Amino acid sequence: MKLHKFENIARFPLFFQLIHRIGGGIFVGSETPRLPCRFRLEKLGKQVYSTSVLFANDKEWGSYPEMIAASDISMRFGQQTLFENVSVKFNTGCRYGLIGANGSGKSTFMKILSGQQVPTTGSISIDKDCRLGYLKQNHFDYEDVPILDVVYMGNEELWKIHQEREYLYSKVDLTEQEEERANDIESLFADAGGYTMEADAAKLLIGLGIPEEKHLQPLSALTGGFKLRVLLAQALFYNPDILLLDEPTNHLDMNSIDWLCNVLKNHRGTVVVISHNRYFLNEVCTHIADLDYQEIRLFTGNYDDFMTANAIALENIRRENQKKESRIAELKEFINRFGANASKARQATSRQKELDKIELQEIKPSSRVSPYIRFNPRNRLGEKVFEANGVSKRYDHTLFENFSAVIGSNEKVAIIGTNGVGKTTMLKLLLKLLEPCDGTVNHGETVELSYFPQDAGEILNLEDHAIDWLARFAPEEGLSEQELRSFMGKMLFSGDEVHKPVQVLSGGEKARLIIAKMMLEAGNVLALDEPTNHLDLESIEALNYALTLFPNTVLFVSHDREFIRSLATRIIEIDDGKVTDYPGTLAEYEDFKRRRARGR
């Protein structure tokens, strides 16, 4: 029997279609398997073959052992327990999405894995000689450091060699001892990949949207979001065996997310990633590590696979419990009816024994809670909503010019493009929150806007308490405190949380408070600028569903491909000063761009 091993299976989709046809249904449809795999093909006779596939999570996959393991990990902060006695293994060749509700302890667990935090109990073991890298958040430590050097620092060994090499070569005269050391350093520099370090670092930075002309500038020359991209390049530059990434897609545009997906899918080691981007989790992950019930459970497959499997498992438990409850009722009725009957005593005793053995399977309360979001417009919306005529906007350079468009009712319009091209500016121009340099913007007479800004500070008063700030947007007749509490409860503010000062709210809480404001306003046109940035997966899905149900116009900026794909009926893309207005979904628009690139 001959064993064929494919390191990059994504290159062989047609091959796997063929194997599906001759292999008796190994795969669903013609889908390329997501896991690293080995394919066995055995010839049994003339034109007769036996096929089988080993995936990286199969027991027979002997050469892909665990790389990092957590044993009996518990984490407590005072009376709060985040997780208890967690034991989990992360294997080579697998990419794990660590998911869970906000506050469940995902980032804490990632810090424990990386050695940045000590657990209350338990230990972390890493295979000998494995290199571990993680995404740092300390960009303030590198403000005056050239961007390329920040990336180089991801490989500590190479960085030290590089520094010593630079020092020796900067000296005019070298002693004999220094010359010998310089020769040794040159050899070490070559072995560590020093001759390609600049090209390797530049490739990472360009892939993350940082142009070459910026690479020698200090990190302080970049805005906050781009600084975090440099730290992501730093983690990737090390090319570690184990890569731990906490929210790597934050501040990335769609092109950079696609680039990162490809990098991680080609990573041969172990990846553990936290993300609230469903597209990213579906594209990258071979497994989901679900942090819930103060424990971590592993599922094979991506995020959608996990959601399906989890829903089926819960439904199966409910159905099984219903059957058991029905049987319990039957047994109790018989026992109560015939328990005192001498002729039925043996049967009653038998049924009592059966009853004693029946146990209902516990359905634990999940830490995941979804907010209830619904946007119900108070007044009717006319056909005309937005009209832009010859709109241009310039700062130190031209963002776009001579843009004209008419946006009608019932349209859901996504404004997309790479970071810095002017998406937020375009949105604010259409909302009349900014004045154009040229041209005009008009609103329909019936338009009543409700707005979610990218920067919560634009509308939140940090001195207010949450409930007091929200009360300002109540209908004219007002709402009682109890009614406001009930309303905020739908957005997951409970008890004394409604009186939290706005300034201490988390990013997710601020986002939910602004969404609550939009619900109270009952506007007939909704505008949202990066609404998913600070929301957890459950809140994103709840918002996504509510906007899908909304009967009127939605205008939004987003980098979340799944959010755009499921919602947008029209795409406005800004690319290097050019605006494309496409009347269709994201999938249709991307197909249009591919055909246009091929000249069709």
Each predicted region: which residue ranges?
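Acidic, Ala/Val/Gly-enriched low-complexity intrinsically disordered segments
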Residues: 7-10, 28-31, 42, 48, ...
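Generic short N-terminal amphipathic or hydrophobic helices
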Residues: 8, 18-21, 25
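ABC ATP-binding cassette signature C-motif
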Residues: 49-321, 375-600
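Proline-centered turn/helix-capping motifs that create local helix->coil transitions or kinks
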Residues: 196, 343-347, 357-367, 442, ...
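ABC ATPase nucleotide-binding domains
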Residues: 317-331, 335-337, 344-353, 369, ...
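Short, flexible cytosolic linker that couples an ABC transmembrane/permease module to its adjacent nucleotide-binding
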Residues: 362-380
